[in-house]
Regions:
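N-terminal glycine-rich phosphate-binding loop and ensuing alpha1 helix
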Residues: 1-77, 91, 96, 132-138
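Short, well-ordered turn and helix-capping elements at secondary-structure junctions
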Residues: 5, 97, 154, 186-189
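A generic structural signal for short coil/turn motifs at secondary-structure boundaries
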Residues: 9-10, 128-130, 194-195
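Short glycine/proline-enriched turns and hinge-like loops at secondary-structure junctions
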Residues: 12-13, 120, 161-162, 197-198
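Structural signal for conserved beta-strand scaffold positions within catalytic alpha/beta enzyme cores
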Residues: 22, 93-95, 151, 184-187
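Well-ordered alpha-helical segments embedded in enzymatic catalytic cores
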Residues: 28-31, 104-108, 184
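Conserved beta-loop-beta/alpha segment of the NTase-like Rossmann-fold superfamily
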Residues: 57, 64-68, 75-171, 175
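A short, charged helix-loop
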Residues: 170-200
Length: 201
């Protein structure tokens, strides 16, 4: 989903979609899409709204730009532009016409997803995997091994649980990289009502 307003990133997100804010020399959304591709995902569905066309445009082919770079002999830059999206990956967009939250955004993609397995990626959080296997790749492997849905979480300070979706677990909190059964997600609970300090990433 890329339809949110990015209120935690204002004022920058007032005119630039938060997913397009740069991390070094590339927008955040590119890192997310490339991790999905490395995990074996070839069909990317962006759930967006009318103010986010810059995201759709970013993954579209820019024939005029490519022609100009080629004509000027800027081959290295042309290769980078073309590398934005591998040729065997498809990106499509569906619109979320009303801001009704993450669950609604995911449901907007249901007609396209059908009964196929899918991953929901939130492109506003960066996670350092510490040089190990990327988290999405590990989650895809676990899904195929166990046949059970996976959700990535990160421990947050108690004072900040009211800013995130917080998970309730069945049993103890697992060690990093391990899985545990989950019973619910509570959206932005009051500190005293939070079932844990594990936030959905």
């Amino acid at each position: 989903p890329v339809a949110g307003f990015g209120s935690r990133m204002l004022p920058a997100s007032k005119s630039i979609p938060k997913e397009m804010l740069p991390i070094v020399d590339r927008p955040a959304i590119e890192y997310v899409v490339k991790e999905a591709v490395r995990a074996g995902i070839k069909d990317i569905i962006l759930v967006t709204h009318s103010a986010k066309t810059a995201i759709e445009d970013y993954f579209d082919t820019q024939f005029e730009l490519e022609h100009q770079l080629e004509a000027k002999g800027k081959d290295a830059l042309l290769a980078e532009v073309r590398d934005t999206l591998p040729a065997d990956v498809t990106v499509i967009s569906v619109r979320q016409h009303r801001a009704l939250g993450l669950g609604h955004a995911v449901a907007c993609a249901a007609p396209v997803v059908g009964n196929e397995p899918f991953a929901v990626l939130l492109p506003d959080v960066l996670v350092d995997c510490g040089g190990q296997q990327e988290d999405l790749g590990a989650m895809v492997e676990r899904y195929h091994a166990r046949g059970a849905a996976q959700i990535m979480v990160e421990e947050v300070p108690e004072a900040r649980v009211d800013q995130y979706g917080i998970v309730a677990l069945k049993g103890d909190v697992p060690n990093p990289g391990e899985s545990a059964p989950m019973t619910a997600v509570v959206e932005k609970p009051a500190v005293e009502d939070a079932p844990s300090r594990l936030s959905v990433v």
